[in-house]
Amino acid sequence: MLDWNPALYLRFANERTRPAAELLARVPLAQARHVVDLGCGPGNSTELLAQRYAGATITGIDNSQAMLATARQHLPEARFTLADIASWTPAPGESAPDLIYANASLQWVGEHETLIPRLFAQLAPGGVLAIQMPDNRQEATHRVMREIASLPKFAAYIGDAAKVRADILPIRSYYDLLAGPQEQAGVEAGAVDVWHTVYQHPMDSAGAIVQWLRGTGLKPFVEGLPEALQADFLTEYENRVDAAYGVRADGRRLLAFPRLFIVAQRKP
């Protein structure tokens, strides 16, 4: 199982936290008693939740011990639990969450057709499911990863690393999953808000883009390679990124980063 490097992830903390804040800004809950940060990472999103819902029980869920260790140091007042999102449910005796907040995490989990309705059904009546997912698998950053991974010198080691991250569904499918009839009796959406944004991040260089991706998307491609081949992969990747992202008027590169946002509220 992959583990993550919190320090590498947080090199671009402002850029990573911005969509988390914009997702939270659209959550229509003035108060909450129990908030779950599903895929909390190093706690940058959890901090936003704790600031907005002071006094609430905040539970962070992640499958990375390294990320959880950083989150616990940063927010000792919150609860953090090692768990797999694919099978997570509230602990026995725990109150149903008023907010399940999943920022940049569900793209690593498959079978959204069943996952999303299951998470929605875990909410307390009137509760909110808030999701943000990168939608960049067809961007040059990710196409280039797969192209290089298919080269013979890398393919034997990388295998199916391109499948580690789930394909997200068409936007309308998420709307239908939440706005339509639910399997569990008594679970019905009162409102579903879905939108798509393409961020344009100014990056200092092609190397900076590579460093961003090393914190997330590149990891399953590079981690299984011998050390010498890791360097070869990253060199080839940077060369192709350099060719794909032209220099702008100020000498920087614009990194296009599409993201999908979903906010769905259960009827009381």
UniProtKB/Swiss-Prot annotation:
It holds the Pfam family Methyltransf_25. It is an enzyme of class 2 (transferase). The keyword Cytoplasm applies. It comes from the Bacteria. Its EC number is 2.1.1.144. InterPro entries: Methyltransf_25, SAM-dependent_MTases_sf, Trans-aconitate_MeTrfase, Trans_acon_MeTrfase_C. GO terms for biological process: methylation. GO terms for molecular function: trans-aconitate 2-methyltransferase activity. Catalyzes the S-adenosylmethionine monomethyl esterification of trans-aconitate. HAMAP family: Tran_acon_Me_trans. Belongs to the methyltransferase superfamily. Tam family. This is Trans-aconitate 2-methyltransferase.
